[in-house]
Each structure stands twice: as C-alpha cells, then as structure tokens.
C-alpha cells in the first residue's frame, strides 16, 4: 500500500544552496575534532522527509536533540526549483515532544552544551590583568542581554569581585580551601589594574564577531540572519 504524502507547515529561513554548503563545510570540520557526536544524514537517509536534502542531529545530553533540516526544490508550482531553506527544531529522545526553535535560541542551547566561553588560560590571563578577549561563540549570547553583546572576561571578573566585596570576605573561606594564584601582587596589582581599566566605563561589547579562527557552526549564520559575512543571503523567510 502506497504511503500518503502528508503536508506540514514549518518555520524556515530561505537561503542559497552555496550558503548551506559553506555551513556544512564548517560543521564537518568541527565534527572531525570536538563535535564527534553530531550526526549528518544525506537526503536518502531521511526516510519520508520530502524535499529534505540533508539533516543534522545535535544531541543535547539527556534532554533531547536539535534537528536541522535543509530543504531544496521548494514551491515547484512557482518554478523555484533551486530554492533552498533551513528549519531548526528541538525533539526529546522519546519523540513525544517537538517544537520549532529560532536560530538564536538554538545557538544558546548549543553554546551551553558544547562551547565554554573561556578557557583556563583565558581566565589566568584575566587574573593577571591582561587584556582578553571575547567568547568565540558570540551567537550563543543573544538571549543574555538586550543588545546581544558578549561580556568580556574582565567585566565578568570585576562583577564577581565587587559582589565579593559587597557580601563580605568571610564567605570566600567557607566550605573549602581556596586555590592560590601566583604573581597576583598586592590589592593594587592585578585587580587594581582591572578596576581602573573597566570600572569607570560601560561594558564593551559588539554584535560583530572576529573571524581570525575557523568559524563555529552557528545557526544564525546558517539561517542567513548574519549572512553578510558570506554575502549570499537574501534574509527572506518562507
């Protein structure tokens, strides 16, 4: 008995085929290194998923997974045989719950599970008062504040330090021993330099990332909402 085709409505972002290919290249590069539990499915592996050219499965621990579907040959009745789009959803492992998610929310979920903001070396640099940096996965911070800015490590350290002064020093030594860091100097040393540099001005931040390193597999880039880095996005939804 032939299976009947079922039509569903999905939230999608219209992009070019070249845009999808570049994003796939980024994902495959990271899948060879740190994202080995991500799964890539070709169109013939997606079963009865009509118009699906490929699919990515991104596990999020025991909660569920993010499913990224890449579509092709959409709206053939209008002659758009080369039209591509992407859709992002979250599903639990029991397949009893599924919901569409926006690229910024998906980036936030992926960031929390796979990409820590700062390495141990970056934290040591901040303690010494050196000027460091930003989280390399900026897209995962869109939900953190109104402007989507990523807080610098110095700003976060200064916030913790001021909270420590406000709440009292005794709490620092309760419960467990504190790891000492060498070369901190006096109170006018590393912390003092950091306060002078960051305490009298507003937090710095930017919605534009630095691309010196290999780009990370951001859903914002895939959906075209940050497509001007590649120049292939028309920013149209279907």
Swiss-Prot record:
Q: Name where it's found.
A: Host cytoplasm; Host cell membrane; Virion
What Pfam families would the database entry show?
Vif (PF00559)
Function statement: Counteracts the innate antiviral activity of APOBEC3G. Forms a complex with host APOBEC3G thus preventing the entry of this lethally hypermutating enzyme into progeny virions. Functions as an adapter molecule, recruiting APOBEC3G to the ubiquitin-proteasome machinery. Targets APOBEC3G for degradation through the assembly with elongin BC complex, CUL5 and RBX1. Binds viral RNA and affects the stability of viral nucleoprotein core. May play a role in viral morphology.
The record's misc note reads: Vif-defective viruses show catastrophic failure in reverse transcription due to APOBEC-induced mutations that initiate a DNA base repair pathway and compromise the structural integrity of the ssDNA. In the absence of Vif, the virion is morphologically abnormal.
Q: What is the effect of changing residue 135 to S?
A: Complete loss of interaction with CUL5
Q: Does the keyword ATP-binding apply?
A: no
Keyword Ubl conjugation in record: yes
List UniProt keywords, sorted A-Z: Host cell membrane, Host cytoplasm, Host membrane, Host-virus interaction, Membrane, Phosphoprotein, Ubl conjugation, Ubl conjugation pathway, Virion
Q: Say which family it is in.
A: Belongs to the primate lentivirus group Vif protein family.
Protein name per its UniProtKB record: Virion infectivity factor
Induction or repression: Expressed late during infection in a Rev-dependent manner.
Gene, per the UniProt record: vif
Modified how: Processed in virion by the viral protease.
Q: What is known of its domains?
A: The BC-like-box motif mediates the interaction with elongin BC complex.
Annotated GO biological process? viral life cycle
Q: Which residues carry this modification: Phosphothreonine?
A: 99
How does this protein lie in the membrane? Answer: Peripheral membrane protein
Impact noted for substituting residue 111 to L: Complete loss of interaction with CUL5
